[in-house]
């Protein structure tokens, strides 16, 4: 009697390899998006020439990992505490909403960067 079976081990290995490649591509794509966002935020951040420490010089972004494929863009600890004063204003300072407008400006561009990176890496 003949046994009818199909060996799927090679298919499972290929799926596992593709999944690993997809995760690595996602990390690289998100990193590219975060890098673009940090550069654009640097351009849009207002500068006060009366101070020596400029927020523009303290923009950072986190590197994504396979477990956390997210890149957070913002200011380092040295100037982050005062970013909201510029964004929302104070009693004596008018608001300069650069963070919110930057997010709105680059939302579609960052999505396109991530999508094109994923497509390029998954070919």
Regions found by a protein language model. Give the residues of each.
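Short, Lys/Arg-rich flexible segments
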Residues: 1-123
């Amino acid at each position: 009697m003949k046994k009818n079976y199909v060996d799927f081990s090679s298919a499972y290995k290929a799926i596992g390899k593709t999944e690993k490649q997809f995760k690595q591509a996602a990390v690289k794509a998100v990193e590219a998006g975060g890098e673009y966002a940090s550069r654009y935020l640097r351009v849009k951040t207002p500068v006060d020439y009366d101070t020596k420490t400029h927020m523009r010089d303290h923009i950072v972004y986190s590197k994504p990992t396979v477990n956390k494929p997210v890149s957070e863009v913002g200011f380092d600890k040295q100037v982050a505490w005062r970013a909201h004063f510029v964004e929302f204003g104070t009693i004596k300072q008018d608001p300069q909403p650069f963070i919110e407008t930057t997010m709105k400006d680059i939302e579609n561009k960052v999505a396109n960067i991530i999508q094109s990176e994923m497509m390029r890496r998954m070919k």
